[in-house]
Each structure stands twice: as structure tokens, then as C-alpha cells.
Amino acid sequence: MGNKINQEIHKIEIPKELHDRSIVGVKKAKTEQQKRKFKNPILSAVFILGLFTTSVAFAFPSVAAQIPFMNNVISYFNDEEHRYENFETFSTDIGLAQTSNGLTVMIDNAVYDGKNVTISYALETEREIKEEMEINALNWFNIVGSSGMGGSDQITKVSDDCYVGLASFTPHFKDEEYPDTIEVTWKPEAFYSLSNNLEVEGDWSFAFSLNRLEGDLQLVNETVQQENVSFTLQSIEFTDVSTVISYEQVIKDDLLQEWESVTPVFHITDDLGNVYMNGTSGGGTSPDNGKTFKGSSDFGTIQEGASKLIIKPVQIASLNSGKGHVEIELDPIVINLSK
């Protein structure tokens, strides 16, 4: 198959103080998800590849059979925290691929654990480009009926013409009522690199549904606090691919007057010494400019033999835009695992 043009994928640069999986977009519950548009003058000089647009959709198995690295995209992203070790086993095989303007976009697998969505995908290009580039999609994934979302994206270059990506995000629904089935859409419209003045426009359009994984919910409702911060761990849910913590925090006005945002990150270990999160976070919503914040974070499945989970919240009080921050450590919450 000769579908080869270069692109890395939608890659979100996370502020240093919020680490690599912090919130990239916390949108209020009633805010409509906005479409990102090019407004950078650099793009006026962008070299647009391709004089015309063609679009071809085909069944994914016929593509995967010719592309060895597509047998298990998630394997490129597994880490020491074992975050995705069961993804391939319990995720849904999406099997969608479309080619437009010489760029093939392929969606491999996806999973919805009841709050968070993880999608593995790949790009294959018509043209070999050896230099490293940061490539972004004009539009990100959308969940029908959600009011917004926060999440992160990763991209790994497999070869000069092949890239694999992993998107993880948390959609937000009114009153935190997460449906049993979600509808996912994605219309990238273009992939671009500002650093290399490269843009590929095309006609890709994907739509698929995901059913919620069954999980075991353990209520916690334990609160830790300092003078200006109150943090409540509400629950923890165990699924075949992930562990999801849900929480709520309340910040006093005095702290918000000094700092523009106060966002939690977590250090999570078990009694055997396994590390599940180390200064990272997830998505959430705030109806009152950060005074109250409801969120969730997910990590991999609990390692066999562990009987306790130690969750240590750390509040990042920040001026944003790299202007400075402080860390506010809270007491750890110890959960006896009933699973």
C-alpha cells in the first residue's frame, strides 16, 4: 500500500507545572466545545501538499494486514506504570481507515471506562520525511452530547512515513451523568506543523460508538484539607483496563485571589511499592471559576497482591503562563482495596 505523507498527530503541549497528563482544556459545564481555527500569520506561507483532495474509505483489516506496526498500536505507549497493559484485550476494535490527499488516517482501538475515553490511531504518509515534526490535527475528537472535555494526546514516530497516536480524554456531561453508550466523532479537516510550514488538508470523517465497561465501584468519601483547600475523594472504580478516582475540591477565595488556578495532581502507590501516578492528573469541570472543582483521573489496573492504595493529592497553585506556581501538599488518603 502506498499511502505515505508525513504527519505526526495532534500533540498537546502541557504546562510544566501540570505535568504530561494534566488538563488541556477544562470547560465549564454549559460551555460549547469550540472549534480550533488557524489564526497564525505563519500559515499564510504554509506549503499545502496536494493540488486536489480525494477521499477513500475502506475496511481496516485489509489495511492492518499490510502494516505490521498496526497489530498492536497500544504497545508503543505502555510504560512503567502499566497504564495500558489490558487495553488491547478489553478495548473495542474500531477498524476504520480513510485516505485523503495521500494521508491515511486509521483508528485502531478504543475504550470507554465509564468516564474516560482512550483511542489508539495511526497515520501513514505518501512521502518519507526524516526530520522530527510536531503535527497537530485542526479538530480533535468529539463526544456527542458532551459539554466539553479535557485530556491529552501522545504521538510516536514509527518510521519516516508511519506514526502512531494515543488520545486520552474525559468528556463532561450535564450533572455528571455519564451514559452507558457514547457516540464518538472525528473530522480532523487538516494536519499541520507550524515549525515546518507543512499542512495537509483532507476529507476524513469518522463516527463510532463505545459501550461503557462494567466496573466495581467502591465509595470512599474521605476528606483531607489545609487552611484554604478541601479535597474529597468520592469514589474509586475498578474496570478491566483502568482504575478511576472521582473527587471534588473546594478552594477558598483568599487562595484564588493570590493564584489564578489551583489544580490537583496525584502521587498514587500501593502497599507493594508499585507507582500508578507520579504528579499527573485528569480532567474536570468548575461552575464557579475554580472555587469548586469536580474531576476524575484514571490509571492502570491494580497490581495483583496489593491490599492498600495510597493516594496523595498535591494542589498546584499557579499564576499560569509560566509565571510561577507553588505546591500545596495534602495528607495521603489510604484505601483498603475490597476488590
Predicted regions and their residues:
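Alpha-helical, hydrophobic structural elements that either
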Residues: 4-6, 10, 19-22, 54-339
